[in-house]
Amino acid sequence: MRPPHRTLNSHQVHRSATRYLQEHLPLRDYKRSVTIRTLWAVLLVTAAEVGSLHATCQWLDGLPAEETVRQAVYACLPDYAELQRRLNRARAGRLPKALRRRRQRLAIDLTLIPYHGEHFRDPTEVYRSKAKDGTSHFHAYATAYVVHRGERYTVALLPVRRGAALADVVRALLRQSRSVGVKPALVLLDRGFYAVDVIRYGVSQSSEQERTLRLNSLSD
């Protein structure tokens, strides 16, 4: 018997996401001008729109000055490595148990977000690739995900820096997937991962009993 489904409206999704993320990434009020509620509204809209803090501050009404919001975000967030760990724990906490019961078809994707600005602290933050939308500079991240009963579940997430060896990215995503209990029966790779080091890694893994790694294009 299929479990019952119910449709959530945008307000319910927003409240649920805020409550759950606050448990794993506790933010705090910044002075008197930026409350926890405001911070999460800004961060969730920015993430949902795959946009910038600047664009969100221009779009939402009733916010403090953009620079004040920016300072509040920087004051509340932990360092980059700790932020990744907390968000990965949050993501893993809501994976269906069924994903851990048997090996899954795991798809690995490389996402490039065009970026026209400068790096924040380290030049390797900005990835270089074939020009798109008028730039060859991107913020890049890689994901490993499973499609289960028509829903996509991201089981591993990793930022990709300029100069990163793609085979190391694949290896790290598979390691993350195993750490949350999801083991691949088959790995499908986006064509962005078609590189000599990745192919060599795939060949080296094909004889292992622990998993099977096959190269397949996720896009034309």
Feature locations, PLM:
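Short secondary-structure transition/capping motifs
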Residues: 45-49, 58, 62, 76, ...
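Short, conserved catalytic/metal-binding motifs centered on acidic residues
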Residues: 41-42, 56-57, 102-116, 144, ...
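N-terminal-biased segments
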Residues: 4-7, 156-160
